[in-house]
Structures are given as structure tokens and as C-alpha cells.
Amino acid sequence: MPKKTKARILHVDDNQDTRLLMAAVLGDAQYGVMTAGSVAEAMQLASEIEFDLFILDIRLDDGTGIDLCRKLREVQPNVGVLYYSAYASDQEQQRALAICGDAYLRKPVGIADLEEAVANLLAKKGIGVAEDSTEETPATQPPA
């Protein structure tokens, strides 16, 4: 029986501290996390690597999370999308989910709530956390 591999997550946020925190938290939860600081960087990574989940900020320096979701779904149509943002009103949250996306968390959120949302979205896709995986997907950050 083949071993499960780590679920691959791409987190896109223009705030470097948020990217580092997300990579650390989800890495500790046994996910393989890569980060991007822009729409352009996210699209580059998504064209090279197959992901299981995208975690997107709504407001990015070079676009919106909603527009990025649409673009990412063109490249990887079956990947779950979790919005993670501090800027959304109830209306904006509903709009984002109606257009493109599977779930929404408003910053700040507790670690347990974040891990639960990620696990639930991955479970809907039939993906669990790897146990004793030999595959390593390092947490990364864009160059300074």
C-alpha cells in the first residue's frame, strides 16, 4: 500500500509575516506549505506544482483573491479554495464564495479553527494528513 503524501497547500498573501506564520502553523500540522506574495508568483507556482488547497487573501498588491481564484481554477480546476482575509464585509464574503471559493475565514482566527477549516476542505477532496510520509514538501517563502 503506498504511503500518503503530504497535502500540498499554496498560501497567497502580500504580508510576509502572515505567510511565515501560516507556513509554520500548517507545517506543524503535517501539511506541505508553499507561499506566494503576489498573483504573479502564485500563478507561476501553480503552473509548476500540483496543489491540493489554495489559501488566498482577498486583497493583494497586484490583484484580488477572487480574480486569482478564477485564474488558479483554470490551471487546477479541482483544487479547494479557502479565503483567509481581514478585509471582507459579510457582503464581500458572500460575493467571494458565490463567484469562486469553498470556504472563508476572517483574520484573526485561532489555530484550531484554521486547522479545522483546512482539514475539512481537504477531506471533501478525499485528502488527509500524511502519516510517516517519506515525501517532504518544504515551507518556502519568496526571496526578500
Give residue ranges: language-model regions.
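Alpha4 helix (beta4-alpha4-beta5 surface) of REC/receiver domains from two-component response regulators
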Residues: 67, 88-105, 116
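C-terminal output helix
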Residues: 91, 109-118, 126
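Acidic catalytic/metal-coordinating carboxylates
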Residues: 38, 64-67
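Short amphipathic alpha-helix used as the core "switch/output" element in two-component signaling
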Residues: 66-77
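Acidic, metal-coordinating helix/loop segments flanking the phosphotransfer/catalytic sites
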Residues: 35-53
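Two-component/phosphorelay signaling modules centered on CheY-like receiver
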Residues: 16-34
